[in-house]
Curated annotation (Swiss-Prot):
The lineage of its organism: Bacteria, Pseudomonadati, Pseudomonadota, Gammaproteobacteria, Pasteurellales. It comes from Haemophilus influenzae (strain 86-028NP). This is 1-deoxy-D-xylulose 5-phosphate reductoisomerase. The gene is dxr. NADPH binds at T12, G13, S14, I15, G38, K39, N40, N126, E128, G217. Its EC number is 1.1.1.267. PANTHER family: 1-DEOXY-D-XYLULOSE 5-PHOSPHATE REDUCTOISOMERASE (PTHR30525), 1-DEOXY-D-XYLULOSE 5-PHOSPHATE REDUCTOISOMERASE, CHLOROPLASTIC (PTHR30525:SF0).
Length: 397
C-alpha cells in the first residue's frame, strides 16, 4: 500500500496534534506531507524536525521567515511558505491525498474551500465552513467531486451510525427514505452544568477552559461551557446530514461516552461509543472505509458506573437556543453569530466581558445585521467582517 500524503491545516492546534499522533502510530500508511499553522514558530519547528514534511506554511509572514531560518540552520529540507494564498495552494496540492481541515474559526474557510474545489478528500474539523457557508459549501463538495468526511466526534459518531448509502451522500442524505427518524446530538454540558445560575456572573476564564472530559483549545473549551459548541454542531449536522429541525434532537450526556446516536423508525437506536479521544474519529476518517490503529485506550465497560442523559436548559445555555434559531433565520444569521462569538469569547478570555455577556453580544450582533440572502463567498466574508465590528463596538459600550 502506498503511503497517503496528508496535509494538516492547523497542525499546531489540538486536532492537528492528534492527527500527527495517528500518523506517528501508522508510519507505513501515512506521511505528513504539509503542515500549516498560524504564527507558532516553535511548535511548527518541532513538528518539522519530527515529521519532516515536504512543506510547512505559516499564515504570519514574519513567523514563516523565522521558521525558514531555523530549519536551514538545522539542515531540515522542508520548504517554508507564507500567507493565506500559499496555504490555499497547499490545500489543493496535486500530491495531497487527504486534507485535514482543522484551522479554528473563519480563518479556515478559504483553505478548506480550496481543498474542496480541487476535488480532495477533506477530513472536516473546521466547523465554520458549514456554519458560515452551508449550502455554498455542500454544493461545492458535490460540484467539484470532493469527498467529505466529518471529524468532529459527534458528527463522526452520527456518520458511523448511518447506513452506507447515507455515508456516500453527505449533504444530500435522504434520511426518511433510509428509515432515520432522529439524529441525536449529545454534549457533555461543559463544566457548569450543575453550577447554580446565580453564580454564572462570577465564572472566570480559568474555570471555563477546564473541560471535564475532553482536552481542547481555549476557544473551543469556552464554546463547550456556553454550549455554543453544540449550537455550531447542530448547524453542521443540519447541513451534513440534510436534516430538518424535526429530525434533530440535542441531549446532554455528562460522561461523553456516547458521542451521538441515530434513531430509526423501527424503534432501534444506534450509538457510537468510545473514550473521549479525538484520535478515534480522526483515525476513522483517515482510514475510511477501513479501520486503523489510533493509539486510543479501549473503552472499559466495567469502569463506566452510569450513562446519564439530561434535557438542555436554554436559560443555562442561551447560546444553544441562539444557534438553533439562527439556522432557522438563515445563513446570514449563523455567519454573524459565529463571527460575534469568536470576538466575544476572546474578549472573555481577555477579561473584558463576563461569561454571561458572551451570549448577549452574540444575540445583539445578529439583531443589528440586516437579513440578507448569501449568494457567494464574498457575501459570507462581508457579513463576517460586519459582525466582528458590531461585536467589538458592543464590547466597548
Amino acid at each position: 500500500m502506498q503511503k497517503q500524503n496528508i496535509v494538516i491545516l492547523g497542525s499546531t492546534g489540538s486536532i492537528g496534534k492528534s492527527t500527527l499522533s495517528v500518523i506517528e502510530n501508522n508510519p507505513q500508511k501515512y506521511h505528513a506531507f504539509a503542515l500549516v499553522g498560524g504564527k507558532n514558530v516553535e511548535a511548527m519547528f518541532e513538528q518539522c524536525i519530527k515529521f519532516r514534511p515536504h512543506f510547512a506554511a505559516l499564515d504570519d509572514v514574519n513567523a514563516a521567515k523565522i521558521l525558514r531560518e531555523k530549519l536551514i540552520a538545522h539542515h531540515i529540507p522542508t520548504k517554508v511558505l507564507a500567507g493565506r494564498r500559499a496555504i490555499c495552494e497547499l490545500a489543493a496540492h496535486p500530491d495531497a491525498d487527504q486534507i485535514m481541515a482543522s484551522i479554528v474559526g473563519a480563518a479556515g474557510l478559504l483553505p478548506t474551500l480550496s481543498a474542496v474545489k480541487a476535488g480532495k478528500r477533506v477530513l472536516l474539523a473546521n466547523k465554520e465552513s458549514l456554519v458560515t457557508c452551508g449550502q455554498l459549501f455542500i454544493d461545492a463538495v458535490k460540484n467539484y467531486g470532493s469527498k467529505l468526511l466529518p471529524v468532529d466526534s459527534e458528527h463522526n459518531a452520527i456518520f458511523q451510525s448511518l447506513p452506507p448509502e447515507a455515508q456516500e451522500k453527505i449533504g444530500f442524505c435522504p434520511l426518511s427514505e433510509l428509515g432515520v427518524s432522529k439524529i441525536i446530538l449529545t454534549g457533555s454540558g461543559g463544566p457548569f452544568r450543575y453550577t447554580p445560575l446565580e453564580q454564572f456572573t462570577n465564572i472566570t476564564p480559568e474555570q471555563a477552559v477546564a473541560h471535564p472530559n475532553w482536552s481542547m483549545g481555549k476557544k473551543i473549551s469556552v464554546d463547550s461551557a456556553t454550549m455554543m459548541n453544540k449550537g455550531l454542531e447542530y448547524i453542521e449536522a443540519r447541513w451534513l446530514f440534510n436534516a430538518s429541525a424535526e429530525e434533530m434532537e440535542v441531549i446532554i450526556h455528562p460522561q461523553s461516552i456516547i458521542h451521538s446516536m441515530v434513531r430509526y423508525v423501527d424503534g432501534s437506536v444506534i450509538a457510537q461509543m468510545g473514550n473521549p479521544d479525538m484520535r478515534t474519529p480522526i483515525a476513522e476518517t483517515m482510514a475510511y472505509p477501513h479501520r486503523t490503529f489510533a493509539g486510543v485506550e479501549p473503552l472499559d465497560f466495567f469502569k463506566i458506573k452510569e450513562l446519564t442523559f439530561i434535557e438542555p436548559d436554554f436559560n443555562r445555555y442561551p447560546n444553544l437556543k441562539l444557534a438553533i434559531d439562527a439556522f432557522a433565520a438563515g445563513q446570514y444569521a449563523t455567519t454573524a453569530m459565529n463571527a460575534a462569538n469568536e470576538i466575544a469569547v476572546q474578549a472573555f478570555l481577555d477579561r473584558q466581558i463576563s461569561f454571561m455577556d458572551i451570549a448577549k453580544i452574540n444575540s445583539k450582533t445578529i439583531e443589528r445585521i440586516s437579513p440578507y440572502t448569501i449568494q457567494n463567498i464574498d457575501d459570507v466574508l462581508e457579513i463576517d467582517a460586519q459582525a466582528r465590528e458590531i461585536a467589538k463596538t458592543l464590547i466597548r459600550e
